[in-house]
Amino acid sequence: MLWSVLRHILWVALLLLVLSLLGFVILLRDPLNANLVTQNIYIGYFHYLGTLLQGDFGITYNGGKSLMNLILTVLPPTLELCFITLFLAFIFGLPLGIISAVNSEQVFAKSLQILSYVGLSIPIFWLAPILLYVAALSHWEIAAIGQYNLLYEIKSITGFPVIDMWFMEVPYRTKIVQNILQHLALPTLVLCILPTMEIIRIIHQRAEYILNQNFSKVATTRGWSKWKILHQYVFRNTFPLLVPQVPRVFTLVLTQCMLVETALGWPGIGRWLINAVNEQDYNSIAAGVIVIGVCIILIDTFTKIFTFILDPFKKKGWYAK
């Protein structure tokens, strides 16, 4: 097992090295950074790598602000949106996937399957402004710009207003909660569609496969209820297989989040990166690419550890020579 752990650590280190190389190549697109390779490109790269290891991403092209401080400002809103979206996607996707598998021959299940494939093909950059337009016409009590109304002063402790508001001792906390939820409603609704449909599709296929196995059919002939079959066979053989899909779904949500932030004015890293591309701020682009890559690598690593604990069969790969 020790060799397997070392192999995974080396793999993560290699990915981080590739990310740093990618950031260095992007950085060299800016003529102002040509001094990094005046002597030798290898010396310039190792100098850049050393600054990254110290947590120094440099400064922005416009304004000369510290990139580390900017990233610590724009990253939490994006992670907040992604985690809430994933939570809601699992809350709605798991039961709907099971229901569609149990009643696979009914109209509801067929409609849900068709809807899941349609939802996977909807372009998010088109859906966000459409829903914003519908919300404005229908007078929905939601907000479309920012995380909360700037009239409310929320002291940043964790970087997530949805958590920081509970540390405030103010008489109007209920109004703050309502305002934050109103700002979260529209971007979360837009982002939830695609991962929810993906989870429904995965759960439906796996649960339907389990229900068609001989042991499930034998349990039915023995008089077991549907709930007992689901509890004994379907849940135990379906949900653990969904855990390895978390990094892929998270990456999908993070990618879509960049477009939604731009369309709905969410102050996250996606909107910041797109603005950096428009301004040709290569320092910011390089730092943003590295930070997003590190987030995905961390999610993938935690998922592998959780899968190792949850699924005994995965331990074979860790103990293999």
Curated annotation (Swiss-Prot):
<feature type="transmembrane region" description="Helical">
    <location>
        <begin position="8"/>
        <end position="28"/>
    </location>
</feature>
<feature type="domain" description="ABC transmembrane type-1">
    <location>
        <begin position="75"/>
        <end position="303"/>
    </location>
</feature>
<keyword id="KW-0812">Transmembrane</keyword>
<keyword id="KW-0997">Cell inner membrane</keyword>
<feature type="transmembrane region" description="Helical">
    <location>
        <begin position="41"/>
        <end position="61"/>
    </location>
</feature>
<dbReference type="GO" id="GO:0005886">
    <property type="term" value="C:plasma membrane"/>
</dbReference>
<keyword id="KW-1003">Cell membrane</keyword>
<feature type="transmembrane region" description="Helical">
    <location>
        <begin position="289"/>
        <end position="309"/>
    </location>
</feature>
<keyword id="KW-0571">Peptide transport</keyword>
<dbReference type="InterPro" id="IPR000515">
    <property type="entry name" value="MetI-like"/>
</dbReference>
<keyword id="KW-0653">Protein transport</keyword>
<feature type="transmembrane region" description="Helical">
    <location>
        <begin position="180"/>
        <end position="200"/>
    </location>
</feature>
<dbReference type="GO" id="GO:0015031">
    <property type="term" value="P:protein transport"/>
</dbReference>
<comment type="similarity">
    <text>Belongs to the binding-protein-dependent transport system permease family. OppBC subfamily.</text>
</comment>
<comment type="function">
    <text>Involved in a peptide intake transport system that plays a role in the resistance to antimicrobial peptides.</text>
</comment>
<keyword id="KW-0472">Membrane</keyword>
<feature type="transmembrane region" description="Helical">
    <location>
        <begin position="117"/>
        <end position="137"/>
    </location>
</feature>
<keyword id="KW-1133">Transmembrane helix</keyword>
<dbReference type="GO" id="GO:0071916">
    <property type="term" value="F:dipeptide transmembrane transporter activity"/>
</dbReference>
<feature type="transmembrane region" description="Helical">
    <location>
        <begin position="249"/>
        <end position="269"/>
    </location>
</feature>
<protein>
    <recommendedName>
        <fullName>Peptide transport system permease protein SapB</fullName>
    </recommendedName>
</protein>
<feature type="transmembrane region" description="Helical">
    <location>
        <begin position="82"/>
        <end position="102"/>
    </location>
</feature>
<dbReference type="Pfam" id="PF00528">
    <property type="entry name" value="BPD_transp_1"/>
</dbReference>
<keyword id="KW-0813">Transport</keyword>
<dbReference type="InterPro" id="IPR035906">
    <property type="entry name" value="MetI-like_sf"/>
</dbReference>
<feature type="transmembrane region" description="Helical">
    <location>
        <begin position="150"/>
        <end position="170"/>
    </location>
</feature>
